[in-house]
UniProtKB/Swiss-Prot annotation:
Glycan attachment sites: 179, 239
Cytoplasmic-side segments: 1-47, 99-128, 207-211, 282-313
PANTHER family: FORMATE TRANSPORTER-RELATED, FORMATE_NITRATE FAMILY TRANSPORTER (EUROFUNG)
Designated name of the protein: Formate-nitrite transporter
Keyword Iron set for record: no
Family designation: Belongs to the FNT transporter (TC 1.A.16) family.
Species of provenance: Plasmodium ovale
GO annotation, cellular component aspect: plasma membrane; vacuolar membrane
């Protein structure tokens, strides 16, 4: 429990580069609460944009990884170099989403769930935000896959074997993803969204720009290189795989991968992270509400500091 003489105030002039764990949680709840204030149309636009960003960077990651999948090069560096390059390129998507204020379903599983647990959004608002976010991400990722990745022919199968390494790289990724068992896929998806939600938490905790970039980059890189399953990234990757006729089927994509990945991602954000954080920091948020009037400010421009009645702690 917070000390009786402790309160939370909004200090826009703070020079601190990071928040305490209590402050970070308060910012997370406020961030989740703000999602419900947007109209459905704005939410959809933000979600589509996030899906496009995931598609843009997944495309770039596929090309970069595929270049190192060239069979003669693999003799010297091995296939692991392709995975390293793929993972190193993909985090740019999350930096794009953060800097533009776009809306990603997987991050919402933490932030909006904490707001729901505190009663800051209703069950109906919660379902609205989560469904629009997922649908918009799907539309954005699949649209980019069709109009840019498929339309450009970047991943198409080539007649010459020496030029077929990019197609083969994507094919091998897709085949691996659909050959997990249902339970394996859920477990990999849980691991993935722990990293993604922590990346969101880092953004809310770290106020220094370079520190935020590094923390987000390595959190996302960790899940990408580990082979975890991310629903929005998989929506892009597996749908472009279907479009270019790789060795996967529609049933495998949607029922052996996307469905369990969705379940696992939600479990990670809502149950593995949101519920324990709510249990640990619930009293701090309640105290924050009692001691402070709503500021109406933007979370990007304010700092929540802990101060007592006599001055800064």
């Amino acid at each position: 429990m917070p000390k009786s003489n402790t309160k939370y105030v909004i200090d826009p002039l703070s020079v601190k580069t990071s928040c305490s764990s209590e402050e970070s949680y308060i910012r997370c709840v406020e961030y989740g609460k703000s999602k419900a204030h947007y109209s459905s149309l704005i939410l959809l636009a933000k979600a589509i944009l996030a899906g496009v960003f995931v598609g843009v960077c997944a495309h770039a990651s596929g090309i970069a990884g595929g270049l190192f999948y060239y069979h003669k090069l693999r003799e010297y560096v091995g296939a692991s170099m392709s995975a390293f390059v793929y993972g190193f390129t993909f985090p740019i998507a999350f930096l794009c989403i953060i800097c533009t204020g776009s809306d990603l379903f997987t991050g919402n599983t933490l932030a909006v769930t904490t707001a729901l647990l505190h009663g800051k959004v209703s069950c109906l608002e919660y379902v609205r935000v989560m469904c629009i976010s997922l649908f918009g991400n799907y539309v954005g990722a699949v649209s980019f896959a069709f109009f840019v990745s498929y339309g450009s022919g970047a991943f198409h199968k080539k007649e010459q074997v020496d030029k077929n390494h990019i197609f083969q790289f994507l094919n091998d990724i897709a085949v691996k993803k659909v050959n997990h068992t249902f339970v394996e896929c859920i477990c990999l998806a849980i691991g993935c969204n722990i990293f993604v939600c922590l990346a969101v938490y880092f953004v809310l905790s770290i106020k220094d720009g370079s520190g935020m970039v590094f923390s987000v980059f390595f959190a996302v890189y960790a899940f990408a290189i580990a082979g975890y399953e991310h629903i929005i990234a998989n929506i892009y990757t597996l749908n472009i795989s279907l479009m270019i006729d790789t060795e996967v089927s529609f049933t495998q994509v949607y029922f052996k991968n996307l469905l369990p990945t969705l379940i696992g991602n939600y479990i990670a954000g809502a149950l593995v992270l949101a519920c324990p954080l709510f249990f640990i920091y619930r009293s701090y948020y309640i105290n924050y509400e009692k001691m402070n009037e709503p500021s109406g400010g933007s979370l990007r421009s304010i700092s929540i500091e802990m101060k007592n009645d006599g001055g800064a702690t």
